[in-house]
Amino acid sequence: MNSVSSASTRSRRRPNVVLIMADDMGYSDLGCYGSEIRTPHLDGLAADGVRMSQFYNTARCSPARASLLTGLHPHQTGIGVLTHDDGPGGYPGTINDRCVTIAEVLGDHGYATAMRGKWHLTGRVHEPSDAWPTRRGFESFYGIVAGAGSYYQPVTLTRGEEPAEPPDDDFYLTSRLGDEAAGFIRDHDLADPDKPFFLYLPFTAPHWPLHAPEEMIKTYRGVFDDGWDELRERRHQRLIDLELINDKWPLSERDSEVVAWDEVADRDWQARRMETYAAQVELMDAAIGTVLDELRRTGRFDNTLIMFLSDNGGCAEEIPPGWVDELPNPPLHTRPRTSTGERVRRGNDSTVRPGGPATYASYGKPWANLSNTPFREYKHWVHEGGIATPFIAHWPIGELRSGVDHD
């Protein structure tokens, strides 16, 4: 009876808030948005919550994050493009002191605040500054300060304001972020169970590089062998069947710079790129499942508002061989060698199968064209392919209208 009474009491309190963001994930990359990729945990939230068909971001990593956290146009925050200094006004590339974050506001109103994931709101990534998460309202932080990096040996991995403990042999960033987020919920429940919390969980997945454990990649072997043309058609039909788009909406033409699948010579390598990307998305979903399990275990699930979105559409960037060979010191994205001393093969090379720590590749325009089905263009562009994102909201005791919201 005590546990039932405790759960009932908690249900009447202010809701906890968990805000989850994917990185460079396309509109149709979740199962509940028509994908072949397995995302059971997000699909479950969508089934019991609300999915939006017309939710938008700002088409780039940093501006989307700045707007999400402040409620402002990105230029007002100082993040007009990315985190390099492009001049005065809205382009200094660092979140300024003329805005407040949702963490600062909620913290002032009695919420515990925590962040686990990718920050990417300042170019000063190696030394703490007033633009770091711990100085913008988050009481605790674990993640990367920069905008990208290895999933096995992430550069700028930070706990609080100090370099985090070195990754062990089993380290995989997406999974670790899920564990760290669940750990925050567990520790908070023990320390201050009556206090609501705000947890910001911006994953780096599935942003390049294409990194995923081989055992997960293998589970997608053959799934993408029919190629991007056929798979775009299938996703388009599933989006119609799911009532996310109108059946009068045609599928956009294949990008003019993408060759027909029937003309592709290196199909095995191309399929491998998408297999790895799919593994990254599924592992993010699994990490979200870890967080959901902890919410249920602590009795907080029903009174937690969970929101999920992506920062922009699928990314068409092709990483040329040697693209990051000219590294700053200290490096921003990746180290030249793995922890075992193996040289990292940087760039998209059809002789190198992506996935392992000694690779650094992207899935490129052909597969981004699939990710953004049914739309044109990609991250960077303000066409629908760049700015349309899945959005899922779930709050069992809140007054959310379930189903698909087209408004």
Predicted stretch roles:
Residues 1-407:
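Formylglycine-dependent sulfatase
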